[in-house]
Amino acid sequence: MTFTARLPAFLLVFSTFILVGCPGSGDRLQPDELTSVRQVKGDICFSVNKPVDYQPTLIVISTRLAPPQEWVLYENPSVIVTQGELCIPPSFYRFLDNRTYVVRYILQSKKHSDLRRSVVSAIAITNSSVRSVPLREDEAAYY
């Protein structure tokens, strides 16, 4: 077989790599981290495992089963991780009693901007107290 006969196959393979790129470590999605919650005075605090220098860049809060257009998004929020916890005060978001919420947030390293972590937690507010509840299958990415 001559080169001209193989040219279409070569161009197909070559153009595929040009269009989609080579697979690498950045192409793999990381599963969401799960976390626990506790109440500290009026704040709702989420545990941050190995906080190092991670800070939230996005927080999304929604009631369970709410459509995405009803989710509340905070880009570059004013709350920070301190002592291994991300605490949300009532002045930032008011969680209503007798509801179940899904809280998602992205943590990003200050030193290494390419290091991001996605965290999700489901919480129930009952009689003004908070507790963790199991996530539904469609609320987190487990991979």
Regions found by a protein language model. Name each.
Residues 23-25:
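Bacterial signal peptide processing site
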Residues 48-143:
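Acidic, low-complexity Ser/Thr/Gly/Pro-rich repeat segments typical of extracellular/periplasmic
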Residues 1-11:
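Bacterial N-terminal signal peptides that target proteins for export
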Residues 29-56:
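Contiguous beta-strand segments within globular domains
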Residues 18-21:
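C-terminal motif of bacterial Sec signal peptides marking the signal peptidase cleavage site
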